[in-house]
From Swiss-Prot:
Disulfide bonds join C2-C16, C9-C21, C15-C28. Negative results: does not show activity on voltage-gated potassium channels (Kv). Expressed by the venom gland. It comes from Davus fasciatus (Costa Rican tiger rump). The presence of a 'disulfide through disulfide knot' structurally defines this protein as a knottin. Inhibits sodium channel Nav1.7/SCN9A with high potency (IC(50)=117 nM) and Nav1.2/SCN2A, Nav1.3/SCN3A, Nav1.6/SCN8A and Nav1.5/SCN5 with weaker potency. Also inhibits voltage-gated calcium channel Cav3.1/CACNA1G, Cav3.2/CACNA1H and Cav3.3/CACNA1I. GO terms for cellular component: extracellular region. C-terminal amidation is important for the high potency of the toxin. This is Mu-theraphotoxin-Df1a. GO terms for molecular function: calcium channel inhibitor activity; sodium channel inhibitor activity; toxin activity.
Length: 34
């Protein structure tokens, strides 16, 4: 199960496709890929 946009990604949870965990805020943000 992946984390959607702006979903919390602390604790080793992985973000969904084209998303990356923001190190400072600890939520999933777009990685600028398509």
């Amino acid at each position: 199960e992946c984390r959607w946009f702006l979903g919390g990604c602390s604790g080793g949870q992985t973000c969904c496709e084209h998303l990356v965990c923001h190190r400072k805020h600890q939520w999933c943000v777009w990685d600028w890929s398509f």
